[in-house]
Design a protein with these regions (language model features):
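Active-site scaffold of zinc-dependent metalloenzymes
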Residues: 26-69, 81-85
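A short, structured loop/turn motif at beta-sheet edges
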Residues: 74-76
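Non-catalytic terminal regions of proteins
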Residues: 1-44
């Protein structure tokens, strides 16, 4: 079976990042309350809990297929994911405090790129 979900650990934040590529609802059975992507959706980002093998909180980014992993979509979903993770940690971000979101969004984008290039 071809892998469709990859897990990443940001180390300094108490949440995981999961990247799904063409993952179906069945592939995501270990996650809590996840629905199929709508037909018109290219990618989405969702704060979520994984229930098996142990309970973990984090963010799931799903792409319909490898071709949908474009610069535009990676940037868009990376910012959503970084905002979700920082919000969970109580980190406030604004014009005078841009570094946390910039670094975290960059890390998320790098994780997505590794999935796209098959480097994980």
């Amino acid at each position: 079976m071809k892998k469709k979900i990859w897990e990443f650990d940001p180390q300094i934040y108490p949440q995981k990042l999961w990247i799904g590529l063409g993952a179906t609802k069945e592939d995501l059975a270990d996650f809590e309350d996840i629905a199929e992507m709508e037909d018109s959706t290219i990618a989405d980002t969702t704060p979520i809990r994984k229930l098996k093998p142990k309970k973990l909180g984090g963010v799931l980014i799903r792409f319909r297929n490898r071709l949908d992993i474009s610069f535009e979509n990676v940037t868009h979903e990376s910012v959503h994911a970084a905002m979700c993770m920082l919000d969970y940690c109580g980190v406030k971000f604004h014009a005078d405090n841009q570094e946390p979101i910039a670094y975290l969004a960059g890390w998320v984008a790098d994780c997505i790129d590794k999935v796209k290039r098959g480097k994980v």
